[in-house]
Amino acid sequence: MSVKHIQDNSNQEIAARIIQRAWKTFLNVSVYQHFKSLIDLRRQGEPRQIVRYINPKEAQLLDAAAGVQVRFRLGGVRFPPEIYYKIFTHRHIEDLCANSPRDYTKLPARYTSHNKDDPPQVEDNSGWYRRVENNGWRPVSYRFWMPLESGVVDSTKESEFHFSKLKRKQDLEKKRKIKKIDWMRQMYYMGSLEAKATDNETLGLIHKATKGLIKSIEDGGVDSVMEWEVDEVLNWTNTLNFDEYIASWRETATSNSSANLKDVKLQRIQKSLQSNIYGDEAKQAEESLYDDSTYYENAYTKQFTRLTPDSMFGM
């Protein structure tokens, strides 16, 4: 076999690999676009109706007064990805965890004994103030038709829930600050941070401040910088607003809130009641007008302007 023939075969193999790789990339992109189009929502749709198609058993537990909202995300460890959903509530809900700190799953039985030598055991308070919501990201699949033992559909991530409202607010602000710092650090190392200024001296100051802020975070931790410092650097270094980015991300693949939806049947009843009330009031006013004995007299009585000594007409 000649050298030229071997080179031609190798060139054909390289070309075939390029075509196969391009075709595989096209298929993967098409599959991803298909899954993305399935959850292409932005505050659209009635939450209970959407969950009814996914999990009819869970849809029966939804209450519109809770301000329910459903979010969808793509995830998984393999391709093509799976569609996950999670139910959020935007109104205050009173539950057992909010009213009492006890762990009711491990309450001891009642102990009654008159023997002082055998006192009851001291109640263990280690599990108190631990909140488990059982509301993680669940895959949209046929698993809800199976028993619960056949598959785990909930996430194993634990979230802390402190009894103090002030402490919960501080933790929420700290998490938001950590997200901003991680976002800024990732964009800094990827080279995506772009300064808004064009002056060389200003660019040097911005770059120096950004580098010093990231170094302070890496040396002293998150608590070594304030949130307003991170906001200042983000405002100077990037045209993309972090808060707008987070707000847009939360609205992506999200249904409408049940708090914004009104029942059509209830609206019809309200309209009919209002029309009946206003109709009766107008009818009563018209009847009282014609029942007045002076109505016809007042209709044809000439109206004159009375002059008094204090009048200023003609002066």
UniProtKB/Swiss-Prot annotation:
Q: Which GO terms describe its biological process?
A: negative regulation of mitochondrial fission; negative regulation of protein targeting to mitochondrion
State the encoding gene: Mfi
Record protein name field: Protein MFI
**Spans traversing the lipid bilayer:** none
**Which tissues is it found in, per the record?**
Enriched in the pancreatic beta cell and the testis and is expressed at low levels in other tissues tested.
Does the UniProt entry include the keyword Nucleotidyltransferase?
Answer: no
Domain of life the protein comes from: Eukaryota
What is the annotated localization of this protein?
Answer: Cytoplasm, Cytosol; Mitochondrion outer membrane
Under CDD domains, the record lists: C11orf65
Assembly and partners?
Can homodimerize. Interacts with MFF; the interaction inhibits MFF interaction with DNM1L.
The keyword NAD appears for this protein: no
Q: Which UniProt keywords apply?
A: Cytoplasm, Membrane, Mitochondrion, Mitochondrion outer membrane
Q: Which GO terms describe its cellular component?
A: cytosol; mitochondrial outer membrane
